[in-house]
Amino acid sequence: MRKICLIFSSVLLFSSCSDTIDEGYMIDNPEIELAIPSYFPELNSSFNLNKPTKFGVELGEKFFNDKCFSINNSISCSSCHQQKNAFADNEKQAIGVYNRIGLRNTPPIQNLAFLKFYNWDGSKLRLENQPLVPIITHEEMNSSIVEVIAKIENDSEYKSLLKKVFGDEKLTAERIYKSIAQYEYSLISANSKYDKVKTGQASFTANEQAGFQIFQKKCSSCHNGELFTDESFRNIGFPINLDSNEAGRARVTGEMKDYMSFRVPSLRNVEYTAPYGSFGQFPNLKSVLDYLDNGVINSDNLDPIFKNNGNRIPLTEQEKNRLLDFMKTLSDPTFIGK
């Protein structure tokens, strides 16, 4: 696997601050090459239209960490998406401005360049369309993109980076969204023990190997592929938050067949992203496995994997322990900064 490096190809962009072209102005803003294993899925089409560049990623990261995106300048994207938690957090539900409680558990940000859906309900199909959601949501940043631009458009550091990325200093909503997406596209996690085993650089312990075999038999119908998600939307009978108007995927489709269905989460770095469930119903992974074993909530649209098996996934205590051993091999300490 190659380390992240720069493709030293110059991109010519011209200054257009006053609608004139400075033909002597050249910007070296090379695309960055990401350390993507050959066995990973294909990059999505949005990535290919907005490939991360040296300064695009730097600009996106600056936006990502800027508290001016919230109405009272108290939180940034990184307030909820913390690197130490695989860019999730340890809260049951996201905490927004004025300590408002969000609808759902904060999703991790990793390997987004390969996904087809974003948000737990799949409401966004392009990553570039996602950043506006937390900006305008009452329980999150409760601001507007117009207000954000007004706050930061005269910042000298932003002006410098905008010129390096786009050729002029003009700040627009589209440029904000594209830059944040470039930064998030660059967050590739592929350096776990599992990856080292996959590439012949390490071996599973006996317990990890046993856990992998149990996982293949009892978990991989949903958590499959190298991202350990099939990106489907399923109702798996988790406890329902009676204090919210949650409907899962049905909020997007308006169809009862999607009621309380959520996107199957990737299990990469799952060790770091507790609590679990759409609103943090489970404090740890063991409690998730116990719940699946004891039996989930039945409903008309309960996923057939449960519906056809007594509404549960039977697991012995030994199987649960081995599964926990295996899932820890999906942890990438370098990704979370350890």
Say what each PLM segment does.
Residues 17-338:
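Periplasmic c-type cytochrome electron-transfer domains
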